[in-house]
Amino acid sequence: MVRRLGTVGYNVLLPNLYYRAGHDTIFGPDVLEEGSAERARMRAVRTKMTIPPVMDDAAAMLAFIDSQAEIKRGPVGCHGYCMSGPYALAAAARYPDRIAAAASFYGTWLVSDAEESPHLSLNKVKGELYIACAEHDSLAPLPMVEELLALFGRAGTVGEIELYPGVHHGFAFPLRWCYDKPAAERHWERLTALYRRRLG
């Protein structure tokens, strides 16, 4: 997926979100199976990955980008899938003068009771947001999507929330059982169009 975005002409930085659990943290193939030991281990690690430390990581990534002479200084885009969807939105709010475009694909916990829930800072975003939601998604259910739509409008956020009909959480990843090629291709089209508009 990183290579595909790179072929469009962008420099792409892919962070290891799990590095706090060890730089060599990996999960076996059964991490995709509900009830498996690997999935439980992944969830235990994930619960410690709250937005504040990830925003510190985002600051470090922006500093790294700025230190690279071969990368033209300018607006930055970010996007995330599943649990990293809220990180992308939070980063757009935390660094509004740098992040001109952000996208979340079947992002979880976009609206929650957490103090750092992304919906609370939509009004701080200066860039454009694109949020794609799956119709069948227990991790980002339709009531949350409907609430987010209302909040989006009230905050005056520039962007779009789109519901992908008939697909499941994880539809963009080719190795998942829920992979849906037409929806996955649409997500690429929407993402690259967003980046072209905002990043050039």
Predicted regions and their residues:
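N-terminal cap/leader regions of alpha/beta-hydrolase-fold enzymes
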Residues: 1-200
